[in-house]
Amino acid sequence: MRPRPVIGDPVRRRCGRAWVLLVLAGMLACGDPDRAIEARLTESERAIFMRGRSVAVPCWTCHDLAGTVDKVGPSLAGVFGRRSGTAPDQQGSEAMLAASIVWDERTLAAFLMDPSGFVPGNRMVSPGVGDPEMLRALLFYLRHVSQPGARDAEPD
């Protein structure tokens, strides 16, 4: 019977380093899906975009941008110009269908500030984005990443 390795022994340290390198290599290979978008932005726009990206992190719990992942909320791909409750492959709530809102900068801002107040009875559980600068950044980010193919385009 072999003795259990002690934390810090040379074998475990080598394996640990290899694991970290493997994870880092994988991350580098995948790249940043927003790189093509960022390349087209000015420096000040990039700052707003990155802030919006941070604000959007909780959104990805229920939503996606590809429309291929089965999530609780609708895909946000192509959300601008779409009517509420009509996302492809998603059964919209009765409240969203009845509201029949066309999503644009103004309607998304009002909804994201107070989801249950703007569309009573909808299923979104977010309390809303109360900070105007955070909301502005989130909308800027969504405007850019939700366009079909936006993340696929190569920078000029």
Name each model-derived stretch.
Residues 1-14:
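N-terminal secretory signal peptides that target proteins for export/translocation
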Residues 56-66, 138-142:
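The canonical Cys-X-X-Cys-His
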Residues 15-21:
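Sec-dependent signal peptide recognition
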Residues 49, 66-102, 126:
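Gly/Gly-Pro-rich "capping" loops immediately C-terminal to redox-active cysteine motifs
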